[in-house]
Every structure is written in C-alpha cells, then in structure tokens.
Swiss-Prot record:
HAMAP family: NAD_kinase (MF_00361). It comes from the Bacteria. It comes from Dechloromonas aromatica (strain RCB). Its main location: cytoplasm. This is NAD kinase. The gene is nadK. Transmembrane segments: none annotated. Keywords: ATP-binding, Cytoplasm, Kinase, NAD, NADP, Nucleotide-binding, Transferase. One of its GO terms (molecular function) is ATP binding. It catalyses: NAD(+) + ATP = ADP + NADP(+) + H(+).
Length: 309
C-alpha cells in the first residue's frame, strides 16, 4: 500500500491502508480502553486489525480483545500496511527497530509524557483516523544507525537504533577511555563518561540533555556528543551520514553499549563498536498540519511566558 522511493531510501507516499496493526505500551494498562476503542473504530471502517502479541497478552487482561488476530512483529511486517503505536517515544523506538526491515510505516498516538515521535493526542485519536484511512497523512522517512560489536576480530553482537547508540562507563564511577576513528582516520583519544552517537531523530533525546545540537530529521548527519569529557575541548561534532564510525575501548572497568536506551550489552577492554547509517529507514506518517518546529515549540515550551502567582 506504500510507494517505495529508492533514491530517498524510504516511502514517497502511501495509500489507504486495508490492514493495520496496533502496538501498545506493554506495561501500561491505562491504554487498554483506548486500544479497544481504536480497534473497534477501524473494524467498523472495514479495516483488518492485528494486535501485537505482547500487547494483547497484557491489555487482554483488562479488555476483551479476542475478536482480533494477535501476531508477532514478524507477521506484522509481512502483512500489515502500517502500524499504529499507542504509548510514548519508548514504545515507538521499540516498534521502529522491530519493523524497519519490513518497511512498515508507523503512526504514533501519545499515551506518554513529551512524545516527540507520537503526534496524535489520545483525545484526538479517533477524529484523526479518517484522514489516515483516506491517505491524507504525510510520510517522513527517518534514518537509523546500524552497529556491530567485534571482539578479537569476531562479531559478537549487532543491532539498530533510531535515536542513538551510547557507549559509556557503566556502573563504575571511573571514566571510560576509547579511541575514535572516522572512515579509518584517527580523530582523538577520549576520556569521559561516554559518547552518544545520535541520529537527527535522537537529537532531542539524550543527546540534547548532554549539550548536543538539535538536528532537523530531514538532515543526513550523525552527531557525536561526549558525555562529561575530561578535556573541555572535546565538543559535539556532526559528521556525514555515509561515515563509518569506530570506537575502540582502551581502558574501562565496566564499559557498556546501549541501543536506544532499551537494549544493553556489556563490553570488554579491546572491543570495537562500529557504526554506520543503516540500510533500513523507518517511515513516520504525520497528520495534516504537522510541523516539526511547532512540535518543538510545544514540547520544549519555547516562548512560554512565566505564569504569575
């Protein structure tokens, strides 16, 4: 139901979906009624509805979901025209990593706090569905990072990240020391609490809290943001998205690598973490009138006047 644009590595447009998967925040029972109402509404509009299996296992304890098919992410990727995610940014991150390889677009309904990636407020959920089903949402492609960890020359792990990949010192208080290489060229030796490697999507997450720049999602760049560097001259830098990045662990007691803050792997001294732009993208579908800067203005409370006593 979508038109793939190979030049942009993503979707240029989409048409009215016939099969929609619903993915919810696993341990948030308060979304149960919203998910049931949404499933009912889509069914009445003639849409085939799938409910992600773990979502159904948790939400099904509160509301009756027995009339709908439940399936895992692999089946969603094989059969769904798009997925609607009910939750916060964390739920979107998990769904994006699981579905990016299948080119399934995502729509976010905000059931969390800030919700930089979940455009639709819960109270507006059903009123927005007509625009979605009639093909009036706007597609936007977001890049992901692909990472692999090698130890003694052998790959021991790999994963993708939509927001960021973070290499840090772990639970031990001492700094981590590693070497940074870009396209095979030595850049610097960094002693710090860690390094955030962020996509434009992730630039409003951990990276922003660490002093990194906000990158418009349409940019093709990767931000490298040191965490509390020992040398204050180690500042955030932006590199091209076709860059190969390599981090070599020189000295650390408990080093770790984190993918979107959700998947963690213990590292060892001498390990290498290699990062590049993933061959996969994820497509977000935005409602009519969506503006990235309007979203930032609202979420970050730009230009807000102080409230009086």
């Amino acid at each position: 139901m979508q038109e793939f644009d190979p030049m942009n590595r993503g979707f240029a447009s989409y048409r009215s979906p016939r099969t929609i998967a619903l993915v919810g925040k696993y341990h948030s029972l308060e979304i149960a009624e919203s998910l049931r109402r949404l499933a009912e509404y889509l069914y009445e509009r003639g849409v085939s509805v799938f409910i992600e299996r773990e979502t159904a296992e948790h939400i099904g304890k509160i509301v009756d979901l027995s009339r709908w098919v439940t399936c895992g992410f692999n089946d969603i990727g094989a059969h769904a025209d798009l997925a609607i995610v009910l939750g916060g940014d964390g739920t979107m991150l998990n769904a994006a990593r699981r579905l990016a390889r299948y080119c399934v677009p995502l729509v976010g309904v905000n059931q969390g706090r800030l919700g930089f990636m979940t455009d639709i407020a819960r109270d507006d959920m059903l009123t927005c569905m007509d625009d979605l089903l009639d093909g009036r949402f706007a597609p936007e492609n977001r890049m992901l990072l692909a990472a692999e960890v090698t130890r003694d020359g052998k790959e021991v792990a790999s994963n993708m990240a939509l927001n960021d990949v973070v290499v840090d010192k772990g639970a031990i208080g001492r700094m981590i020391e590693f070497e940074l290489f870009i396209d095979g060229e030595f850049i610097y030796n960094l002693r710090s609490d860690g390094l955030i490697v962020s996509t434009p999507t992730g630039s409003t997450a951990y990276s922003m809290s660490a002093g990194g720049p906000i990158l418009n999602p349409t940019l093709t760049g990767i931000a490298l943001v040191p965490l509390c560097p020992h040398a204050l001259s180690n500042r955030p830098i932006i590199v091209n998205d076709n860059t190969d990045i390599e981090l070599r662990i020189v000295n650390a007691d408990d080093p770790r690598v984190h993918f979107d803050g959700q998947v963690t792997l213990d590292l060892e001294r001498g390990d290498c973490v290699r990062l590049r732009r993933s061959e996969h993208t994820i497509c977000f579908l935005h409602p009519p009138g969506y503006s990235y800067f309007a979203m930032l203005r609202q979420k970050l409370q730009w230009s807000e006047r102080p409230k009086g006593p």
